[in-house]
Regions:
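Glycine-centered structural positions embedded in regular secondary structure
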Residues: 23-24, 157, 399
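Catalytic-core regions of glycoside hydrolase
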Residues: 28-29, 67, 118, 124-128, ...
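General structural feature for long, well-ordered alpha-helical segments within catalytic domains
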Residues: 42, 80, 118, 146, ...
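Feature activates predominantly on carbohydrate-active enzymes
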Residues: 1-111, 118, 124-128
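Hydrophobic alpha-helical scaffolding
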Residues: 74, 108, 144, 206, ...
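Short, Φ-rich (hydrophobic/aromatic) sequence segments
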Residues: 1-2, 276-287, 398-406
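C-terminal functional modules
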Residues: 291-412
Length: 412
């Protein structure tokens, strides 16, 4: 306000842009693929959280992988993909269609043309971004020279000719450090030497499931001679199907901005429950240096269940860890209550009754027992409730069992 009471507006420019060019998800899990409606909702969600990439690669779609990758989609399924592409465009999301030919590919002209024909069909459905996956295969399809030859052929005969198509993305067979040959002039080095420089190469980190570190990215970038396109296997749970991974998206190096070309999260087969982890991935890829995983987890819970955010946080906090698994990947769970439980059990083991901890745990178990009813009563997201309902049932039982156990211990 000026001295004469007038309001003066000063011009300014607000500049906001992402650290990572490609940000989104890869539907790349094993198990039942998402439904058409699930994908529509996901694409709308991505638009809201500034994600711009959705890679279609469900392992159990036979027209994406074997046995039918050479064949066109049936008319009804093709129509759905066309509608998904249109929805993606409305939300400023690139729909990337991936093919997975490596299980039974023949390294000949016929199969090279078969890939181009399939891409041409998908191009006709509106797709302008493409990927080729060679992950989780063995035998003939794993040869790096042959893979590079096919990818360069696609680049020269399809990507370059089409003037409106984005750079080709590939997922290698050796897609993490623990599975990679460390010797020079082997698989990754061959890809780095032979692949056209514009082709993007995906990478899951030091392991199949694990954290993303700058050190690990530098290791692979040197070998593939380009910045890796990160495929982060979180919150995917196909290796622990009886668990939900709904905790914070952490374990992501905030100094890796200049070491990655893209960042996509591989979600669970439960799309609504996956939104918690996806939200964190989106915030990380937009601004690495300012990323705070716990802050963004709280924001995600508030956005995903605004009708009952506190109850939802309680549920997510206690459904975060995959438990014992073959990947040896663990997550923090029950963060605030864990030390109380440990102190309680320690005191009991020493024949002392921990009155203070008992009172805290009594409140906690009461809260756990009541949380499912609160979520069911207040949430308007029926799809989410349907996805997590088995865990809501067990969560209530956990709270009731905990309360009974405390009473038994105090009586003893």
């Amino acid at each position: 306000k000026t001295n004469d009471g007038k309001i003066k507006l000063y011009p300014c420019m607000i500049t906001d842009y992402p650290d990572v060019a490609y940000r989104g998800t890869v539907e790349g899990f094993y198990g039942t693929p998402w439904s058409f409606d699930d994908r529509i909702e996901q694409l709308r969600f991505y638009g809201k959280i500034k994600m711009n990439t959705y890679i279609y690669g469900p392992k159990d779609d036979p027209y994406h992988s074997s046995p039918s990758w050479r064949e066109p989609y049936p008319a009804a399924e093709a129509k759905q993909i066309e509608a998904l592409v249109a929805e993606a465009n409305r939300n400023k999301v690139d729909f990337v269609w991936a093919i997975h030919p490596g299980k039974d590919i023949q390294w000949n002209k016929n199969d090279s043309i078969a890939v181009l024909n399939k891409f041409e069909m998908m191009y006709g459905l509106g797709i302008r971004s493409f990927a080729v996956f060679f992950d989780d295969i063995s035998g003939e399809g794993t040869q790096p020279e042959k893979q590079a030859g096919l990818l360069n052929y696609i680049h020269n005969e399809f990507i370059k000719i089409k003037k409106d198509v984005n750079p080709l993305i590939m997922c290698p067979t050796e897609y993490n450090k623990s599975w990679s040959n460390p010797k020079p002039n082997t698989y990754l080095d061959i890809l780095g030497e032979k692949l056209d420089p514009s082709i993007l190469v995906m990478w899951t980190g030091d392991r199949v499931v694990g954290d993303i570190t700058l050190e690990g990215l530098n290791w692979v970038n040197t070998r593939i001679k380009r910045n890796a396109f990160v495929w982060w296997n979180f919150p995917v749970s196909d290796y622990v199907r009886d668990h939900l991974l709904m905790g914070p998206s952490y374990g992501l190096d905030i100094h890796a901005k200049d070491a990655m070309s893209g960042f996509v999260s591989n979600p669970m087969d439960k799309p609504e429950a996956s939104k918690v982890g996806i939200f964190g991935a989106a915030m990380y890829a937009w601004n690495l240096s300012e990323y705070d995983s716990n802050k963004e987890w709280i924001a995600a819970c508030n956005i995903i269940m605004p009708e009952a955010p506190e109850a939802f946080k309680v549920f997510c906090d206690h459904n975060s860890d995959p438990g014992i698994n073959g990947h040896r990947y663990r997550r923090d769970e029950s963060v605030e209550s864990k030390p109380v439980v440990e102190k309680y059990l320690k005191e009991l083991s020493e024949d002392n009754f921990p009155q203070k901890e008992s009172e805290v745990l009594a409140c906690l178990f009461k809260q756990i027992a009541e949380t499912p009813a609160t979520i069911r009563a207040k949430s308007t997201n029926e799809s989410l409730i349907k996805e997590i309902d088995p865990w809501l049932i067990q969560f209530e039982h956990l709270g009731l069992a905990g309360s009974v156990s405390l009473k038994m211990a105090s009586a003893w």
